[in-house]
Amino acid sequence: MSFRTQPPAPARLNRCQLFGPGSRPAIFEKMAQSAADVINLDLEDSVAPDDKPQARRNIIEASHNIDWGNKYLSVRINGLDTPFWYRDVVELLEDGSERIDQIMIPKVGCAADVYAVDALVTAIEAAKGRKKRISLEVIIESAAGIAHVEEIAAASPRLQAMSLGAADFAASMGMATTGIGGTQENYYMLHAGVKHWSDPWHWAQAAIVAACRTHGILPVDGPFGDFSDDEGFRAQALRSATLGMVGKWAIHPKQVALANEVFTPSDAAVAEAREILAAMEKAKAEGAGATVYKGRLVDIASIRQAEVIVRQAEMAKV
């Protein structure tokens, strides 16, 4: 193991990030009452250009007037390649309430993108005397973003989370698909006349998880576009959780329960993790570094694996 200790990710639930357009204030109350851990009010793709100033005002007003409870309140600003982003940051932090927790930066391609937002946020916080330190989440949505993923993950101490934006990522990569997440029809191997589908997002997700875990950031899976396909959403979420991601976006309210289900350890998983920890405690007391649990080897690494599940359960109060 390296002498450099791997920093822990923020100790907060991020199982589901529910998105809603800033141009639709009528849904804000319902979002606040949802079971999502994170609320993402959007100023970017879901808001038409002419509606962006009003959407900004809607979010600012909602930050003052809506009871967001224990939700982590995040706002996705416009991309740094647009004329809207700086005004998003300035108005949100000068006029918005202290209830805003996070700014989400889309289409991040390099560390300099994060530096730019961080510098502006820092200046406004100082000028306005804001008490709460704003955190950042970035979205990897391009070939450049995935190529520079580790430097992006290390770009700012404000950075708490990183998501994969599948649709724009696919477009940037030139992928032959119009799907948003999930299995793609033509991405398969053929063996003995039988198709075996693979996951075209796997390598990008794995790169994001590795960069995030190296720098103490929460890795999050992005959207699943077909909100009529519950099993497809669940399958994608299960793959992401197995890789080490902590949560997933919901672009429809019905996806919130699915995400929470997948990213909350089951009672059986928690019970097994606790049994492994107990078995290893017994082994250590007997001077052994490993033992057998249900017919399989468990050792010091198994302790770390089990502790991940137990920590997740404790945060979710399972």
From Swiss-Prot:
Q: Which UniProt keywords apply?
A: Lyase, Magnesium, Manganese, Metal-binding
Question: One GO molecular function term?
Answer: magnesium ion binding
Q: Domain of life of the organism in this record?
A: Bacteria
Q: In the UniProt record, does the keyword Ribonucleoprotein occur?
A: no
What is the uppermost EC class here? lyase
Name the reaction it catalyses. Answer: (S)-malyl-CoA = glyoxylate + acetyl-CoA; (2R,3S)-beta-methylmalyl-CoA = propanoyl-CoA + glyoxylate
> What's the name of the protein?
L-malyl-CoA/beta-methylmalyl-CoA lyase
| Catalytic activity, EC | 4.1.3.24
To which species is this protein native? Rhodobacter capsulatus (Rhodopseudomonas capsulata)
What does the protein in this record do? Answer: Involved in the ethylmalonyl-CoA pathway for acetate assimilation. Catalyzes the reversible condensation of glyoxylate and acetyl-CoA to L-malyl-CoA and the reversible condensation of glyoxylate and propionyl-CoA to beta-methylmalyl-CoA.
Please give the family membership noted in the entry: Belongs to the HpcH/HpaI aldolase family.
Record note on cofactor: Divalent cations such as magnesium or manganese.
Q: Name one GO biological process term.
A: oxaloacetate metabolic process
Q: What does the record give as cofactor?
A: Mg(2+); Mn(2+)
Q: Where does Mg(2+) bind?
A: 141, 168
Modes of activity regulation: In vitro inhibited by EDTA.
Q: How does it assemble?
A: Homohexamer. Dimer of trimers.
Q: Binding positions for substrate?
A: 19, 24, 30, 76, 167-168, 251-252
